Amino acid sequence: MDFSQTQFHTIVGGQVGFAVPLIVAVTGHRDLVAEEIPAIRERVSKFLTDLRDEYPDRGVSVMSALAEGADQLVATEALRLGIPLIAPLPMERKLYIRDFETIKVQENFEFLSSRAAETYELPVTPGNTIESISEYGDARDQQYAQLGVFLCAHCHILLALWDGKDNDKLGGTGQVVRFHHDDVMPGYTPEATGSGLILADDESDLVYHIVCSRDRPDGQPAEGLEVGDYSWFSLDKDEPRSKTLPESHRRVFRFTSEFSKDAIRYSDKISDDAWPLMTKEDHAVLPVGLRDIDHVFRAADWLAIHYQKGMMFALKSTHFLAMLMGLMYIAYSDMLPMRIFLYAFLGFFVLATAIHTIGNRRSWHRKYLDYRTLAEGLRVQLYWAAAGVNSGSKTKYTHDTFLQTQDPDLGWIRNVMRVAGTECDASDYSAQAGLDFTLREWLGDADSGQLGYFRRKGEELERRHRRTEQMAKIVLWVGFAAISLFVLMSADLGELVRDPVVVLMGVMLLFVGVRQSYSFSIADAELIKQYEFMFRIFS
């Protein structure tokens, strides 16, 4: 199938192609001190350049609301460096532009927004209306609070041009930084809200803080901070501020970059062979943002299948070679003690070790599991978005609730999902067409969708598991019959058939043992239970 059009026209995180960019969101003060701007600009440029150089396989995109001051400064530097710009606006453009006090700032906003790769207008917050947010006051401030939450939820690094002071201004820089760390924004989040992640290691808390002052009375930085200072600022208990990227985040970024590198390497095959969740007919009636999720899903799904083939090759090969090693041992010890059998044994051992080593170095098993997990997370994310399902919280998105209790290293999967779902999360979609699509394609019936998939796979695994058990029973009874005949035979006849019977039993037991080991390695019994459970859920 030729889906090349999807590859070249789908923009994910401000970029085309299958790589998932590193997203830097901007929060900062509007009233920067003019004398400090050159140094701040230089530091921002150095920061973005270093990131781009360190992660060439995925690239960097900047997310900025293009407000006066810090937002426009960073956006300008990003464009100068050739870094894609994403512009989420807190409200409709015609309402937002009223917050720009001078013609020069408005013109700069218009210029920057015209150069943005993607621009979103966030929906009206729950309980408010277009009329209420048109007036200055709490309702309008709620839009800025929503913007701050959106930036935090859809970036990998929050770039804060900040004086370091906490304040009570709803949606202000101090509150956005606090929300990024603690998931708390007084006046917007419920009082009981805390970190949504059960794990101690939260990959979404990373702030790059550039200290600045403000052009107002008492505008100096917080005590202990100096203008021009910069640091990585996270929830690390031992070293919350550091000059180098914390290792836990570096590890997450490394896995995401590895996915992007693989996606780029196999981009042509993904374009030609990967199977999408949406057809061209679906594109015409469903939100455009779903294409982003589908685009990343195709890469993750194809790569999962690709590395599954490598993993299964290694698994089957090593088990087959183990069986051959056993046969060589039996042949040498019970048939003909020829050295060629020993050489063959060693050769099979070396070959099995080489295959196992190559599989480990290329991470076939880990990548298969990780990419399959990512693909299934994206599948759920797409169908939830199409059906208009949300997490039940105005401060949480689908990716925030995924894999909360799993290995912290899987945080990179949320990193990918937060980029793929950005455009969908920027809209408030709820239509019957999306719900019908989800029920038809995801739920399906006995022959289609997830219902049909789990039924078919469950039956397939059940048949394979049954064959393994039947084989073990056959060998058991054949062995019992052979030993019984051996006991009942005369001494002379028994001596004649003793060696062939022993060899036959050894070979049969070896074959069954390898078969059961293979079945255990691919977890047939456990998968049968899981597929039966999922089939009942979708039923």
Question: What are the residue ranges of the model-derived segments?
Answer:
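Acidic/glycine-enriched connector segments
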Residues: 2-222, 226
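Membrane-interfacial terminal anchoring regions of lipid-handling membrane enzymes
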Residues: 175, 183-185, 194-276
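Conserved non-transmembrane functional hotspots
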Residues: 236-539
